[in-house]
Design a protein with these regions (language model features):
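Acidic donor-binding loop at a coil-to-helix junction in glycosyltransferase catalytic cores
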Residues: 155
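A short, structured active-site edge motif that brings together acidic residues
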Residues: 113-124
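Generic recognition of well-ordered alpha-helical segments
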Residues: 122, 138, 159, 163-166
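Acidic two-metal-ion nuclease catalytic site recognized across multiple nuclease folds
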Residues: 1, 161-205
Length: 205
């Protein structure tokens, strides 16, 4: 059980390269308190760009849905207000951080949030025997409901939250940590990242 609030964040986008013009189509943020979701923020986003057909097929987010959505100037500010001072956790956090940084720059804002905590790294530390730590693979391994082909922001964020709950249970028992907060999660993610760096260095030697 977490002893402080954290926010699970997920973006859907028009592609994987925000620095090359890919934009947000949807965002979801879930506030976690203890071992449950207590509050949520969710919105489609109209960035006045074309949604590629393959993205619509992948996510179910159509051009018409995006065209009818509020502009990023509103959504991003609402998102930052929702998050407040809470730590942010995301699956493949580097991507979500890049997306938010890019959208903030476009609005003339500085992203005020500290580095996100990556749930992929936490999962690699807590479930080391898995060959893949993709969201769907983790959900299947842990028995968490996750509809095949579901790639909407709120669905992905909810699955990430449930994976985090399972990871926290393991952290508490495996490491005898009675109070799990964002600093504990950040240390575990950093340890997993350093282990990967060490393995890569050894392999390259």
């Amino acid at each position: 059980m977490l002893v402080e609030d954290v926010v699970i964040l997920d973006f859907e986008t028009t592609g994987l390269n925000p620095d090359r013009g890919d934009r947000v189509t949807e965002v979801a943020a879930l506030r976690i308190r203890g071992n449950r979701i207590v509050e949520s923020f969710e919105s489609l986003v109209n960035c006045s760009v074309r949604v590629p057909d393959y993205i619509s097929q992948f996510t179910g987010i159509t051009q018409a849905m995006v065209d009818a959505a509020p502009a990023p100037a509103l959504v991003i500010r609402q998102l930052l207000q929702f998050i407040g001072d809470d730590a942010v956790i995301a699956h493949n956090a580097g991507f979500d951080q890049l997306v938010l940084d890019s959208e903030c720059r476009r609005l003339g804002l500085v992203n005020p949030l500290p580095d996100f905590i990556c749930s992929v790294l936490i999962a690699r530390c807590m479930f080391p025997d898995m060959k893949s730590h993709a969201l769907g693979c983790l959900a299947s391994h842990l028995g968490i409901p996750f509809a095949p082909g579901a790639h909407r922001a709120a669905v992905d964020a909810t699955v990430t939250a449930n994976i985090l709950f399972r990871a926290c249970d393991l952290i508490r028992t495996r490491f005898a940590v009675p109070r799990i907060d964002a600093s504990v999660l950040r240390r575990i993610a950093c340890a997993a990242q350093m282990a990967e760096i060490s393995s890569a260095a050894i392999s390259a030697a």
